[in-house]
């Protein structure tokens, strides 16, 4: 099953002919992703990477039947690109762009309400269902088809969890990078809900970080959920000082809230297994699944 994307997913790229769009589309095609075209305004009618280029998302969807889009567009224009994809009713939209103004994302968040679109990101590595479909910037070769669902606010820590679960032979069902911005499209609760309902996903790894209350919300959801699966969590930023932004725009302890200890406490009370070192994520999951 997996979640969000599979081998049947038809993907277009917004910002297709730019350097980032070109490079990562080449990587996706090489991985086996079903890329069906791309969008660059003003370049419609041309071909790029042997795929058709369209002026608008509406046109691309009408001609290709695309149901997913990946966005490699500079921050000043990225929100408009997301809004265009929402307007075209693209089912899964993955926005990689970092640095989109918060007010722009507030407008996007409003447009998502009641829409047919699921937004992943922005400021994220993307989504991958190993061996089937790769949408984003993650290195494909470290992934292996398997049974662990991974959801993370951090890109590089996602790769760490992936490499470790591959190394211990567990593999991944789907990996979702939800992004490190304060306003994003899909949160931990959304992903954990999908993983809990997915037959192929036997256990979940959740990687959080300081700032906001997304992890606390996830802990409450896990506590209330009737479906139970083993969950391992790592929270980055245990030693982070209050008031200092740590890399991501959303990674800041403010107003006395959002500390790693608060999040760890909430998750532990929900029955989640905690690891305090990113080096132990895979081993912790392996041991949890093989105990007694």
Curated annotation (Swiss-Prot):
Function in brief: Succinyl-CoA synthetase functions in the citric acid cycle (TCA), coupling the hydrolysis of succinyl-CoA to the synthesis of either ATP or GTP and thus represents the only step of substrate-level phosphorylation in the TCA. The alpha subunit of the enzyme binds the substrates coenzyme A and phosphate, while succinate binding and nucleotide specificity is provided by the beta subunit.
Alphabetical list of SUPFAM superfamilies matching this protein: NAD(P)-binding Rossmann-fold domains, Succinyl-CoA synthetase domains
Key word Nucleotide-binding present: yes
Keywords, in A-Z order: Ligase, Nucleotide-binding, Tricarboxylic acid cycle
Species assigned in the record: Rickettsia felis (strain ATCC VR-1525 / URRWXCal2) (Rickettsia azadi)
Lineage per the UniProt record: Bacteria, Pseudomonadati, Pseudomonadota, Alphaproteobacteria, Rickettsiales
GO terms, molecular function: nucleotide binding; succinate-CoA ligase (ADP-forming) activity; succinate-CoA ligase (GDP-forming) activity
Catalytic residues (positions): 248 (tele-phosphohistidine intermediate)
Catalytic activity: succinate + ATP + CoA = succinyl-CoA + ADP + phosphate; GTP + succinate + CoA = succinyl-CoA + GDP + phosphate
Binding site for CoA: 17-20, 43, 96-98
EC class: ligase
Family matches, as HAMAP family: Succ_CoA_alpha
Name of the protein in question: Succinate--CoA ligase [ADP-forming] subunit alpha
Residues where substrate binds: 159
EC number: 6.2.1.5
Subunit structure: Heterotetramer of two alpha and two beta subunits.
Source superkingdom: Bacteria
Family note: Belongs to the succinate/malate CoA ligase alpha subunit family.
A GO CC term assigned to this protein in UniProt: succinate-CoA ligase complex (ADP-forming)
Pfam families named in the record: CoA_binding, Ligase_CoA
One of the GO biological process terms: tricarboxylic acid cycle
Pathway(s) this gene product operates in, as recorded in its UniProt entry: Carbohydrate metabolism; tricarboxylic acid cycle; succinate from succinyl-CoA (ligase route): step 1/1
């Amino acid at each position: 099953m997996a979640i969000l994307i599979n081998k049947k997913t038809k993907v277009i790229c917004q910002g297709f002919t730019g350097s980032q769009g070109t490079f990562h589309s080449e990587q996706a095609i090489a991985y086996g992703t079903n890329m069906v075209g791309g969008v660059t305004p003003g370049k419609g009618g041309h071909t790029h990477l042997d795929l058709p280029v369209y002026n608008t998302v509406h046109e691309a969807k009408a001609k290709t039947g695309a149901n997913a889009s990946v966005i490699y567009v500079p921050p000043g224009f990225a929100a408009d690109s997301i809004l265009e994809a929402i307007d075209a009713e693209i089912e899964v939209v993955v926005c990689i762009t970092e640095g989109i103004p918060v007010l722009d994302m507030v407008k996007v968040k409003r447009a998502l309400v009641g829409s047919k679109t699921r937004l992943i990101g922005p400021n994220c590595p993307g989504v991958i269902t190993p061996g089937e479909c790769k949408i984003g910037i993650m290195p494909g070769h470290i992934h292996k088809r398997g049974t662990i669902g991974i959801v993370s606010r951090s890109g590089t820590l996602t790769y760490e969890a992936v490499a470790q679960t591959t190394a211990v032979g567990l593999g991944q069902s789907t990996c979702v990078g939800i992004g490190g911005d304060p306003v994003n499209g899909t949160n931990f609760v959304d992903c954990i809900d999908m993983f809990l309902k997915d037959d192929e996903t036997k256990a979940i790894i959740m990687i959080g970080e300081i700032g906001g209350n997304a992890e606390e919300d996830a802990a409450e959801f896990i506590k209330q959920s009737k479906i139970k699966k083993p969950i391992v969590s790592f929270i980055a930023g245990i030693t982070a000082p209050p008031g200092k932004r740590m890399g991501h725009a959303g990674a800041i302890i403010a107003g006395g809230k959002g500390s790693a200890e608060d999040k760890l406490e909430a998750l532990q009370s929900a029955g989640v297994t905690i690891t305090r070192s990113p080096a132990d994520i895979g081993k912790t999951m392996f041991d949890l699944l093989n105990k007694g």
